[in-house]
């Protein structure tokens, strides 16, 4: 199912207007890691994510906002699910909480693991800007709700559970 098809199905089932804006993207730009993170979302383990603020600045993209919808994509381009941001905050890297790290659902869910993998993930953004990684650099922390878990429910043979953000 494409992002457009999933958005149509979600809107039709939930009563959300199809004119409501949404974005479609893959975690980490896709690949095996992106697919793994999408599966964590579908399993209900991952309810948050983080990006370096610098990445938004480099790409000249607007910051996410509470209430915005996204269709999460797999590396294949197949839509995995619909999420909606419920909280967006800017926090320095060295002040990200263990609670947020746990919500991200990755690895052992510890803050130490989160810092290790996100330092590795954010470093290329700093390098692209000609800067060294900054422990005090701002992170865009997002919390989200999974609204349309089509792949997870399809595998179970159930209908997707629906809600509105």
Tell me the role of every PLM-derived stretch.
Residues 1-82, 91-165:
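Mixed-charge, low-complexity intrinsically disordered regions
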């Amino acid at each position: 199912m494409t992002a457009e098809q999933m958005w149509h199905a979600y809107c039709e089932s939930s009563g959300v207007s199809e004119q409501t804006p949404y974005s479609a993207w893959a975690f980490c730009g896709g690949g095996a890691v992106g697919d793994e993170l999408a599966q964590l979302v579908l399993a209900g383990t991952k309810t948050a994510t983080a990006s370096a603020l610098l990445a938004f600045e480099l790409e000249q993209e607007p910051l996410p906002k509470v209430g915005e919808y996204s269709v999460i994509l797999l590396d294949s381009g197949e839509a995995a699910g619909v999420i909606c941001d419920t909280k967006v905050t800017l926090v320095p890297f060295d002040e990200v909480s263990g609670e947020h790290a746990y919500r991200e659902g990755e690895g052992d869910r510890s803050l130490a693991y989160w810092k290790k993998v996100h330092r590795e993930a954010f470093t290329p953004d700093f390098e692209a800007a000609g800067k060294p990684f900054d422990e005090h650099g701002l992170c865009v922390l997002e919390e989200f709700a999974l609204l349309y878990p089509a792949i997870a429910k399809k595998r179970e043979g159930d209908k997707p559970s629906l809600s509105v953000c």
